[in-house]
Amino acid sequence: MPCTTVLAGKLATNDRSTMIARTDDGHFDEKKLIVVEPDQQPKIYKSVESHVEITLPENPMRYTSCPSVDPKHGIWAATGINAANVGMTATETTTSNPRVLAADPMVELREAKDGEEERCGGIGEEDIVVLVLPYIRSAREGVLRLGALLEQYGTYESNGIAFSDENEVWWLETVGGHHWIAKKIPEDRVIINPNQFGMDSFDLEDAFGARESHLCSADLREFISENHLDLNQDGKFNPRDIFGSHRDMDHIYNTPRAWFMGRCLAPHTYRWDGENADFTPESDDIPWSYVPERKVAAEDIQYLLSSHYQGTPYDPYAGHAEKGGIYRPIGINRTGVTTICQIRSDVPDAIKGIEWVCFGSTTFSAWLPVYTNVPQMPDYLSNVTLDAETDNLYWVSRFVGALADKCYGSCIQNVWGYQDTVNIRGRQIVLKYDRLMRESGDFTLAAQANDELCAMAKEESTQILNKVLRTASEQMKNGFSFADTCVNK
């Protein structure tokens, strides 16, 4: 998927939680948030896209999932948190280069033709969450399981995948059809990744030694050497230069997003604007990781992932005729779902996992926190139809975005108020139920909390829909200033 990812280590956040977040920017895919119980997990998985068939381990865990409502192209689970409080988001579609893809080709489906049997493809975004998340008890285990699957079955696309637990965040990027490289995020860092191979440093000695913070395919050194992939002149190992891309397209689609996020996280650490800027929107060497100048909260990640270059000449809503809209924004119209998987360290195990869910274009939608260790999600999040309606948060968010976009200046203050109110009321409900569950020891109250959260979200989303619909109606092009009473006088 053409997505944007933000990862935060526990010392970079305001509450020592880990957070992994990603916009799932498909083709206006209808999405929902559900809980998958162990008896609902398949024993043999078959991909719709690649036809690969994989026998799954016994004893899967419960996990949350954001699958496509229409199953005709597969599950596309996107993201979730399992019962062991391990989070995962998959995938960030990334880039590669011809040298890598020639040396280790993608494993693509080859249909039966001219008497030849069908050859299955590898695994991809459609499959990865279902294949990995129910079976892992730490972020590191997620990397190792996915790495083994990539080596055995291969993949047909370049992807980045994030894993998190209470203490660690890991980022894995695929390299060609079967290779991979993964890094533990330093605890005090925030990572940004916009549809490009992002990792810009890697310790090969650690990966082939202690394996404390770096993991990779067993033959990665030989793969690089035998295929002359290392283009670096300074002796440093930079995976982005070796495995990634520096295309003209990156400079309008990918690097500008990194530039905007970097200037938010480290506005004074680097110079982002002017003739003497360290980095411009089209720089290929924008840093991948940052020690943020102040600790980040969930709302800061929300801001990054809903941005449209506000405060810059590239904002499509600001009326800059020359530059507005020339770069791909992060908050984009086709987003299906965005989540922040937050694993907290200051609450009991049963309620460590919080998933912040946002449907539709993040610029206009609200983020709702929900507890993940529950038997099912409320209908307002899980009962999403293919036909537009107003009984679920997905479609209401779509309506609000489509209406407010056309009259941005008139609607955006109401939208900001809606987003802030849902954040405030959502946090209040979580704080209340955290306290109740700690005091009572009854962690089944998490389901009741989610019901209350969704009732609040429905109330607030109905109000904002009423407001933007009224504003958009008043600004229709067929409006006329005379009323019937004026004509008849």
Predicted regions and their residues:
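Short, charged, surface-exposed loops that flank catalytic or proteolytic processing sites
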Residues: 135-141
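Short, well-structured alpha-helical segments that form the helix of a local strand-helix-strand
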Residues: 142-151, 301-305, 447
